[in-house]
């Protein structure tokens, strides 16, 4: 854990890094930081410091340093989380923007690092596209002027260092007799009427192509961090889902209809991945499956529905084939319906891809759960080594629910590193080399390292780590910056006044969160440097 004095150092360095263009991790929302350090004034660092020592470097570890997704589902259907106002007038656009900014500010302040923004409902979207109708709840007949809520949300997430994934409701299709959905009008064979509503048929190859096309159309418009599929399954009471004609046409080579249905969802993910490769997209792909992976023989009580048996999701195969980068099972249960299934996800799926536990703070209001259940489940997910947590939904983590908000703030009080996704292992970044520092007479330290020229083009970023030692020999580790885009960073000596020594190390990080450390760190004798600077000013 970090010492209080060291927390003060981090806060001071954060300000210094912001002023000098070093992209430091922040605890409160700020304006976007410059990506390049300003030139040192009044003079450039001139003497490569002799008070330095090179030594093998290993990234610091500890309870306060973890790779973890800290996510929330931001629901737009019916404006449940956002927006409350339609954007069909200038005033409506302004109110939509202001309310989203307040939400993102609050999420950043509370320690989140990932947002799942619902961009497609049951066949309608919140972004302009030629393929599906615009959600009337958000904009009436259309957005005012050139306002684009997805682009605005993406810009605001970037400003706060938040990852944004586009949340697609995949197969349900809302339609009315008075105003049929265009798919029902133009392609009636694509959808099956089931339990009073329509559901796209995953067994129809044209449907799978359509879904993959929606994704590529979206990614050509928006450089989001990922695509997140919800309702990526067969519907409730799937045994009554009337896809017999589709099975006869496309599924007879399978041993039974259940195996065919699972294969349809798996093939959908293959087609999505093929489509992403066709447009050279590095967007992550994730699915929110049901929270109970499969039946557990010795559970000792009814299961309810499960992902594998009830709705034909096969996350184990998805993980083995690398078709998803992570999964977020919706574990909206407690006690005996939570812990055994949590371990199931860990044992069967997490060896292949990260598993992020989807938790249900909405249950506090809707079914009377005590807020402590959420705290227990966060801790259980961490104890089992899962990759993070995600909350459904944003409103139920905010100011209306102070108890659960405090629990989340406490759980997220230390910054987290982004997850490292298996797909990135095939293209690990080069190791930073030649880490050194130049000290200026104005008390600045320019830390720099070398990288291959192509590193900047392929999206490589850098993390700068420090271990400080005070006069009493106490050592503390911190992450000074997690999002540097250039191979240099400027520090200020006055922010290190309480320390006699600082050891620096840097990692190169690719777009999938996979990092490569420098082989040699750099240790600076701060006490000797301060004395040398004082002497040079006489």
Residue ranges and their predicted role:
Residues 66-69, 75-98, 165-221, 309-310:
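Active-site-adjacent "subsite" loops/lids of carbohydrate-active enzymes
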Residues 74-76, 284-303, 341-377:
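Active-site clefts of carbohydrate-active enzymes
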Residues 106, 112-113, 120, 151, ...:
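Polysaccharide-binding and catalytic clefts of secreted carbohydrate-active enzymes
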Residues 110-145:
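Aromatic-lined carbohydrate-binding/catalytic grooves of carbohydrate-active enzymes
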Residues 315-338, 353-424:
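Substrate-binding cleft of secreted/luminal carbohydrate-active enzymes
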Residues 403-458, 512-538:
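Pro/Thr/Ser/Gly-rich low-complexity, intrinsically disordered linker/stalk tracts
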Residues 452-476, 501:
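Solvent-exposed loop/turn segments flanking beta-strands in beta-repeat/beta-sandwich domains
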Residues 493-516:
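Beta-strand-rich modules
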